[in-house]
């Protein structure tokens, strides 16, 4: 099953809202420019309340539901409803668990002032601090909590973040890039104390086959592998 990366979903929404905004702004601007020429002064005296201001007043106040007004209200309603439906649809997609069963599950525990990452390997837990090694071209499900105060875990490039709350397990997912070698920063997005600005983790993307060779070899081999990878970036 093809999975849309989280960042692509947010960019798609951003471009949709931008396109609608540009279209609306262009339409309004064109109307104003048209009005400047259409209703410019002709040099002839007009009767009381017979000018453009009077016509606009009658359209907007005395006859707010004229034919044109109804049409504009209808079109505006369709556009707004379309944006609402698109936003809800994309947000619900992001909030679901990864749509495939073979996602790599990583436990993320926030603390003042760092991140603890846990892999389940062969029934045992392999732990790293502030450095996370993940395979390329893979869905990663983060199960996020905190052991002290409120935090929020997020990786800017993937346009996704989730609250880390003591006693509550939240989840979010990302799809790593196809090519290994990328390194991303993971930040805390919740003011959590004096060391908040220093609470930055590293997410290192490695070759998928190499990662799973170590992962499937047991906790000892995998722990040595991730520590060797991490040592290159410290």
From Swiss-Prot:
Main location group: membrane
CDD domains in the record, alphabetically? Answer: CuRO_HCO_II_like_6 (cd13918)
- Residues binding Cu cation are 151, 188, 192, 196
The record's EC number reads 1.9.3.-
Q: Which residues form a coiled coil?
A: none
Record's bilayer topology term:
Multi-pass membrane protein
Any single GO CC term annotated in Swiss-Prot or TrEMBL for this entry: plasma membrane
Asked if the record carries the keyword Transcription, the reply is: no
One GO term in the molecular function aspect is: cytochrome-c oxidase activity
Compartment list: Cell membrane
User: Mind listing the UniProt keywords for this protein, alphabetically?
Assistant: Cell membrane, Copper, Electron transport, Membrane, Metal-binding, Oxidoreductase, Respiratory chain, Transmembrane, Transmembrane helix, Transport
- Asked if Transit peptide is a keyword of the record, the answer is no
What processes does the entry annotate via GO biological process terms? ATP synthesis coupled electron transport
TM segment ranges: 13-33, 72-92
Origin: domain of life: Archaea
Task: Mention any Pfam family matching this sequence.
Answer: COX2
NCBIfam families attached to this UniProt entry: CoxB
| Assigned protein family | Belongs to the cytochrome c oxidase subunit 2 family.
The protein's name is Heme-copper oxidase subunit 2
Q: Which organism is it from?
A: Aeropyrum pernix (strain ATCC 700893 / DSM 11879 / JCM 9820 / NBRC 100138 / K1)
């Amino acid at each position: 099953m093809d999975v849309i990366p989280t960042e692509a979903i947010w960019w798609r929404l951003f471009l949709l809202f931008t396109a609608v905004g540009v279209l609306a702004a262009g339409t309004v601007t064109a109307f104003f420019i048209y009005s400047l020429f259409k209703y410019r002064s002709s040099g002839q005296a007009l009767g009381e309340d017979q000018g453009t201001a009077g016509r606009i007043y009658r359209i907007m106040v005395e006859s707010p539901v004229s034919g044109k007004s109804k049409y504009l209200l209808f079109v505006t309603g369709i556009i707004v409803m379309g944006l609402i439906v698109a936003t809800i649809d994309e947000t619900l997609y992001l909030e679901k668990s990864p749509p495939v069963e073979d996602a790599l599950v990583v436990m993320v525990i926030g603390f003042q002032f760092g991140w603890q990452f846990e892999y389940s390997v062969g029934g045992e837990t392999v732990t790293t601090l502030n450095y996370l090694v993940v395979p390329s071209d893979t869905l990663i499900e983060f199960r996020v909590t905190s052991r002290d105060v409120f935090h929020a875990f997020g990786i800017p490039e993937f346009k996704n973040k989730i609250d880390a709350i003591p006693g509550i397990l939240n989840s979010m997912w990302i799809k790593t890039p196809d090519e290994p070698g990328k390194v991303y920063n993971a930040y805390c997005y919740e003011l959590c104390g004096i060391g908040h600005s220093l609470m930055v983790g590293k997410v290192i993307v490695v070759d998928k086959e190499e990662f799973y060779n170590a992962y499937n070899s047991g906790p000892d081999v995998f722990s040595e592998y991730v520590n060797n990878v991490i040592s290159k970036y410290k």
